[in-house]
Amino acid sequence: MALRNNTWTLGEWYDQTVAGTGSYYEDNTFWAWGDNQAGALGQNQATSVKVSSPTQVPGTTWSKIATGTGYNFHMAIKTNGSLWAWGQGGYGNLGQNAGPGGGTLYYSSPVQIPGTTWNKVCISQRHWLGIKTNAELWTCGSNQGGELGQNKADVPGQGDTTDNSYSSPIQIPGSWTDLGTGTNRSYGIKTDGTLWSWGSNSNGGPLGLNEASTSHSSPTQIHGGGTNWASLSTSHEKAMAAIKTDGTLWTWGRTTNYNLPSNSDRSSPIQVPGTNWAQVSGSYNSWWATKTDGTLWSWGGNDDGQLGHNNQNPSGISSPVQIGSNTNWSSVRAGLKMCFFRTTGNALFAVGQNTNGQLGNNSIDKVSSPVLIGTGAWSDVGGGYYTSFGIRQW
């Protein structure tokens, strides 16, 4: 583990520290914390231990962490565009052309997915989507609800088995710029700005197609929303959010604990109050978002204090409420009932559920207002069910 030494001046250590002499880690190192069930921390051990502070995963060329919320499996991209996966792979979701048919197969250290031009990836419980630098969209894992977009829920060949899984990546036609996943469902934005969804549509119409329950096993356009969709985020509990190029924020799907502004299920997109939204991330029944002015907002369920308002009101909040008064927030990334926030100086903060040490603050106590995580600057972060990951910038 390489260390560098330097002398810092006032303001160079995060956004808020003092002058002094410090050490920082080599660029692009990868760190993990939380529950190691099924080797989910990528530490080359399968023991189900809890790690409550960041611990390094081998390698120094990591670039991007998968978005979404995987259940005991995770993925990340290296600087050379290679894609890696680890953890539980019983549905073929680790892309190794092996494993469908159960939940016992796992890799406790990262294994490479074929290809070297991966640009972004989003994971769900048992499947994932990935976009390459040429805008191709690929997918792998469980196809139980048609979430792999192959026009069937059970497609023979190419690694598929009777449990509907693909154990090696398969392409979804079209040119794509962004992607999102949920339980047995998938979403994508094409290069023309149109929004598409496919997979299971049960529990509130989470596909956004103005249908209550009809599932779709191939990409279907969400009509009425125009051609100006910019970015996607998913919420684990059957809901979805997306931001348009005009800075408006839209949600739809199942409502729990006021996670939708109407407090009722919505099978088509409905606008969230406010403008100038920059980024949104959701999980289970809560949402967190940043605006272009650097402010941080949250709404939805709050039973673990995950909204960051220094309380644990279980009744939830139905519209966005600002977290604190700072204007230097740059990104949000949700895990299950928790969220990570980065500042413009790439300091890392976390809030919410922490029973497995997944916040990384050397504790297992829940946190109801943002707490600083680790040292150094972080270029990316990701949260799963009970595990979390980060890439150090220095």
Q: Regions from the language model: what does each represent?
A:
Residues 1-27, 31-33, 392-394:
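Enriched but not universal
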Residues 31-51, 87-108, 141-166, 198-217, ...:
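Short glycine/serine- and acidic-residue-enriched loop/turn motifs that recur at repeat junctions
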Residues 32, 72-76, 85, 127-130, ...:
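Conserved core positions of repeat-based scaffolds
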Residues 69-70, 79, 123-125, 133, ...:
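Residue-level detector of Asp-centered blade-edge/turn motifs that repeat once per structural unit
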Residues 381-394:
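Blade-level signature of beta-propeller repeat domains, shared across WD40, Kelch, NHL, RCC1
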